[in-house]
Amino acid sequence: MKMMSTRALALGAAAVLAFAAATAHAQRCGEQGSNMECPNNLCCSQYGYCGMGGDYCGKGCQNGACYTSKRCGTQAGGKTCPNNHCCSQWGYCGFGAEYCGAGCQGGPCRADIKCGSQAGGKLCPNNLCCSQWGYCGLGSEFCGEGCQGGACSTDKPCGKAAGGKVCTNNYCCSKWGSCGIGPGYCGAGCQSGGCDGVFAEAIAANSTLVAE
């Protein structure tokens, strides 16, 4: 009995340590993370962690592709979604496969716009990412590995701590030396890139590069 209790305690301690380690390496954001925004338009949860899904994009979501209860599409007289969200086949605004996948009525639908090498080098509108499969959108599957153009993600350091390196895609180099978008990167202390709202202007300018 004593041996079982000791083993149970050991397993419990290991689980706690593993959870703590995972939490320590999770990217912080929002109020809990110096008002930093998440990369790739990931959602910042009410607890200040970046991710996708209901736990991050649902109730309390602080920034990124937060879910909304707004109606859109044919179910709402043809209304479109704010913040470049997708309008699902059921007429709700959001982000992810259930909104941007089959039946998507508007926004950065996955099969809506082709780009990159699969489309003769065409660029995506509004600085959306062109995925390795040649479709425009936002999120890690579009802006992560294999991204061909647009606001592709980068984990590269920048600024003084990185020998004066600048961020790609006109991303802002924060005062902490990391690339990203939003007040935490482009606001006070921004070292280079689209500081103080210049990024928004760059996106607007890039929107003229829509493929016909």
UniProtKB/Swiss-Prot annotation:
Residue intervals of the Chitin-binding type-1 domain: 27-68, 69-111, 112-154, 155-197
Gene Ontology molecular functions: carbohydrate binding; chitin binding
Protein name as annotated: Root-specific lectin
Known glycosylation sites: 206
Gene3D superfamilies recorded: Endochitinase-like
PROSITE patterns: CHIT_BIND_I_1 (PS00026), CHIT_BIND_I_2 (PS50941)
TM annotation in the entry: none
Annotated signal sequence range: 1-26
Disulfide bonds: 29-44, 38-50, 43-57, 61-66, 72-87, 81-93, 86-100, 104-109, 115-130, 124-136, 129-143, 147-152, 158-173, 167-179, 172-186, 190-195
Keyword NAD: no
UniProt entry tagged with the keyword Repeat: yes
Tissue: In roots.
Superkingdom of origin: Eukaryota
Sequence positions that bind substrate: 36-38, 88-99, 140-141
PANTHER family with a match to the protein in the record: CHITIN-BINDING LECTIN 1 (PTHR47849), LECTIN (PTHR47849:SF8)
Function: Carbohydrate binding.
Residue positions where Pyrrolidone carboxylic acid is found in the record: 27
Keywords: Chitin-binding, Disulfide bond, Glycoprotein, Lectin, Pyrrolidone carboxylic acid, Repeat, Signal
